[in-house]
């Protein structure tokens, strides 16, 4: 009989202590900001040394997906209505809140014929949970894949919520 009493007492003690632990209010976890999500960008062609904009900035939308892919859309001067959105990949880089991405978009002439591509390589730094800046290199290729020219870019962005 004593053994049964001890077992019941131990079982009741475990149930009571487990209930207390499960019901205790826990503070919410502090989530480290990440680049994942939708961003409203302002992009410009920039001086490669100073990062200063050389032309009027243009708006863009970028989405960084949790699987390391990204999609973006902008329509800078000189592009046509048949150009594709940007598609690419992103990754975390060493250091606090540093990322990089590489993407591509295709260009088509007014007749719908493929005329080349543009590739963006960017280094991104989250300046807060809801903003980032980037330094970009843009390469433009003809339809045969020959490099036509490169230039630098700069962007600032805010998270779309």
Predicted regions and their residues:
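Bacterial N-terminal signal peptides
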Residues: 9-19
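Boundary at the C-terminal end of the N-terminal hydrophobic targeting segment
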Residues: 21-23
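Acidic, glycine-rich flexible loop segments
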Residues: 99-133
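Generic short beta-strand segments
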Residues: 41-47, 67-76, 101-108, 135-141
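Tryptophan-anchored aromatic micro-motifs
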Residues: 31-53, 88
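N-terminal glycine/threonine-rich, aromatic-flanked beta-hairpin/loop signature
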Residues: 52-98, 106, 131-132
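Bacterial N-terminal signal peptides that target proteins for export
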Residues: 1-9
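Edge beta-strand at a domain terminus
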Residues: 138-161
